[in-house]
Structure formats: structure tokens, C-alpha cells
Amino acid sequence: MGKIVISENVSLDGVVQDPTGEEGFRHGGWFGQVGDKDREEWAKVEFEEALGAEALLLGRRSDEYFGPRWTGRSGEWADRLNGLPKYVVSSTLVNPEWSNSTVLKGEVVNEVSKLKQEPRRGNRRLRQPSARAHTDEHDLVDELRLMVHPFVLGAGERLFGETSDKKSIRPPLRPDRR
């Protein structure tokens, strides 16, 4: 069975919106404000996650953001991401440009449930807030990995929006203590 892992960059107050500043959010661009050493550590963790993933599960916006940025790159990290199967949840996307992409047009929960049932030995990574909300609500996420950045933004799209009920987040059996 597949394992769904959410890997997300987040501010101290839970904001995930516009980390690069390209969306025009007034508090955007916070990701680029970390120091070089922190960015190097972040890159190491992201690279390790890419090596451990069996596929990427993205929403349309994430696919449209990451695809063009990785397609022309070379090197071990780029080769890994470009070679991975990608599942893009979208009701509007027809022909994704990023290699090895499959569009999942059905209802998010059903499509992700089907992916989880496929026998896999590794992880799938989920990166897209709107799709993530659906998977959180229906207990499809197996692991949550947060890269917390030292900023309080005070506004913006949060990692967890409103839910229908209080949610308990189960800690991993073996916490990662990097």
C-alpha cells in the first residue's frame, strides 16, 4: 500500500501561501529570507525526500509551478524529480507539461484513495494546499513533514484551515530527530 507524505514549507504561524513571493501576496517571499546555511540544510532534506519518494502527488497550481522549474535542469536531484511518476489532481488541466505526469480528474478523495491502494514500497509526496485539505479531512495522510521557517506572517493561507471537527495529529512511531 502507498504511503501519503505531506512535505510542506510553513511559517511559525502556519502560513504556506506564496513562499517565493511570486503570487503577489503582501507577506510573500518569506522562503528566500532564510540564511544560506538554513537554505543548504533545507536542500539536503528535500533531496533526501526526493530520493525516498516513489511518486509526486500535486495539485494543478503546484504542477504548473514546479514543472517548468525542474524540466530544464540536470543533476541528480533534477533527474530524480523529472523521472518520478507525477499524479496531478485537477478538474481543468488536460495536458500537463512535466514529464511522467498523469492527471487525476475525479473527486480528490476517491483518486487519492485509489493511489494508496496500489502496492508501493516508498512514499508519495503531496504538495498542494487545496488537495491537502481534502486528504486531511478523510485521514488519507500517513505522515506530515514540516520545514518551519522563522517568520510570523500574521495572515495568509494556513497549513490547516477550518475543519469539520477537532483533529488529532498522531506523532510518528519513530520521530525524526535531525
Q: Would you name each region that the model predicts?
A:
Residues 1-140, 150-178:
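Portal/gating segments that form or line small-molecule/metal binding sites
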